[in-house]
Amino acid sequence: MNDKYSDSAGVPWEGRSFEQNAFADDDGKTPKALAAALADVPIDKSALVAALTDSRLLIPLIATLGESEQGPHGQLVDKSAELAIVAVATPDKQTAIPVFSSVEDMTKWKGDARPVPASSQRVALAAASEGHSRIILNPATDAVALRTPALEAIAKREQWFPPHKDPWVLGWCEEVAMRHPPISTIDLFDGDPKLDLSHAELLIQLGMRPSVSPDKLKELLTSFTDELRSEEFNQRVDSIGYRLVVA
């Protein structure tokens, strides 16, 4: 005979507890620090990632048809529906999870989406576990894209610099450039200042000596890129583009 302190499976309730809901008092609005970071023009990427690290985000769940059957008059009738996390294609041919800072921003994207609050760490880990290399924050309004290096920093709660401001990246680029005498100067720029994935994350400007022939240029860039792409560099830099100038 089951006593009154057992559940339907006969497991005693004694010693068990419910996990506290960290977002029980959430008003559904954009967290203040995140709102301030998004309001900056242009956006300070380091400040944005820092704000996101301590922010609550909203994951949209979309109802999808589970099973269906034909009704008595030939119509298709839903037997069941499921809630699923959606992914979207990105301009750089990757995939991303759309997330939102507020219920209002989510409603503007899809009015019937169900908001599920989650820490930014959980969002970053969920994207990685599902094989998505980006998240898109507020795709119907701000439309800010975050790439893998930033997501890893958020997941680990680490300080992050965009690669054109990362001292290690600059030092490594200069070291590799010194091994290639035809390169006289090297400068790093933000390749994607609008965070819209329209260009590579890091723009490398190489000052080439006038003596470099067009035939040798392709070979030089291939060699430079191969040496540049160390394991550490790949962890810090999502993608690169080049701009060549005569120097």
Report the location of each language-model feature:
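An interfacial alpha-helical scaffold signature
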Residues: M1-A247
